[in-house]
């Protein structure tokens, strides 16, 4: 127990953004910087402190926001250039340009439709990101900005952020917060589908996968299902879900019409600790039986052999952003002349391409993201 606790506490010692990470910067946009507009749906409480915006306490209602950010010209794939010493510098840091609360669902939907209209016809897609445990609002927001920039996908980025207290000892609180947010995530997903988007994709990380799969399960059993032709990629990255629970969830689903993309790494130390807390039951994000996951209806993206950007090997899928076109192309070609069920791509092993063949045509380009080292 002492060793496991030490692992968790070391995760919490990594650098994190300051309390003022979201203070808007009015300095001119740096030459070569990229702008990102992120729409937010949140079960967090609003926070009046400058630079915080949302805290880790639970809200009784779903809150909305629209946030404009800029990404510096010196940005490196997979990295977040945090603002330093108070206000950031747009030439070197990711910074918030403008942050606005939205008071109603209608305002959020209006923003979403407006952003979709700025995209080319046929590429008016939505990409929803659901973060994991031990995550500040600012961490989730900047990570989505990194993801949207690195993947270079035209999809409108939407952050669904639930009430994590962003502390290493808050695992149980965070787990309960994720569970409590199921209805609100379902609401957000349905809003995205009602926006007129061509397709909607979802990326969940770590504990956010439990929330996402539960919300999708609710949608499935409600009888008010989503239009299959608008479902893009459902990406489960480093999922902190008990494998037996996942099997039960998918039995209720039945085999999905389009396979889940499960991103795993068998050397994930954060999920190893979660195993310990769960009575040494394996987590989906480190599961060793690819064949069983494929039979359940998944394409498995195994990053075990990829060198991680974080010391806990929990955020490896950050590297997928830069190689998103190649990865999507590999999956898409499975519907054409590809004959192998398993391929290797830059150290990433992809299994279950037979699932992708059955589900053609492919959805929008697969984006990727990661959490900072302390997030699980």
Protein language model features and the residues they cover:
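Alpha/beta-hydrolase fold active-site loops
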Residues: 125
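Short substrate-entry loop that stabilizes the transition state in hydrolases
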Residues: 135-140
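Lipolytic serine-hydrolase domain surface
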Residues: 14, 19-100, 110-116, 120, ...
């Amino acid at each position: 127990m002492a060793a496991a606790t030490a692992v968790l506490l070391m995760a919490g010692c990594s650098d994190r953004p300051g309390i003022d990470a979201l203070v808007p910067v009015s300095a001119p946009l740096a030459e070569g910087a990229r702008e990102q507009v992120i729409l937010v749906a949140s079960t967090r409480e609003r926070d009046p402190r400058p630079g915080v915006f949302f805290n880790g306490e639970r809200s009784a209602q779903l809150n909305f926001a629209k946030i404009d950010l800029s990404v510096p010209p010196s940005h490196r794939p997979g990295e977040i250039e945090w603002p330093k010493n108070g206000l950031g510098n747009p030439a070197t840091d990711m910074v918030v340009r403008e942050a606005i609360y939205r008071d109603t669902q209608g305002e959020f939907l209006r923003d979403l439709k407006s952003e979709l209209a700025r995209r080319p016809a046929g590429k008016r897609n939505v990409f929803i990101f659901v973060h994991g445990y031990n995550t500040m609002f600012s961490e989730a927001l900047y990570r989505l900005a990194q993801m949207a920039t690195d993947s270079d996908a035209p999809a409108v980025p939407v952050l669904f952020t639930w009430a994590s207290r962003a502390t290493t000892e808050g695992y149980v609180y965070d787990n309960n917060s994720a569970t409590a947010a199921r209805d609100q995530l379902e609401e957000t997903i349905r809003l995205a589908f009602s926006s007129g988007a061509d397709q909607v994709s979802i990326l969940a990380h770590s504990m956010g996968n439990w929330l996402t799969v539960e919300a999708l399960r609710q949608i499935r059993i409600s009888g008010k299902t989503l239009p299959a032709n608008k479902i893009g990629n459902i990406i489960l990255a480093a999922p902190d879900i008990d494998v037996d629970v996942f099997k039960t969830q998918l039995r209720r689903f039945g085999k999905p019409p389009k396979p889940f993309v499960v991103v795993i790494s068998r050397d994930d130390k954060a999920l190893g600790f979660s195993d310990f807390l769960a009575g040494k039951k394996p987590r989906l994000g480190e599961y060793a039986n690819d064949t069983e996951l494929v039979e359940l209806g998944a394409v498995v993206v195994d990053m075990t052999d990829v060198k991680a950007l974080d010391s806990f090997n929990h955020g490896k899928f950050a590297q997928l952003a830069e190689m998103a076109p190649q990865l999507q192309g590999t999956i898409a070609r499975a519907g054409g002349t590809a004959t192998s069920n398993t391929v290797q791509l830059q150290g990433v092993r992809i299994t279950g391409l037979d699932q992708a063949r059955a589900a053609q045509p492919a959805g929008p380009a697969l984006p990727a993201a990661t959490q900072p080292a302390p997030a699980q």
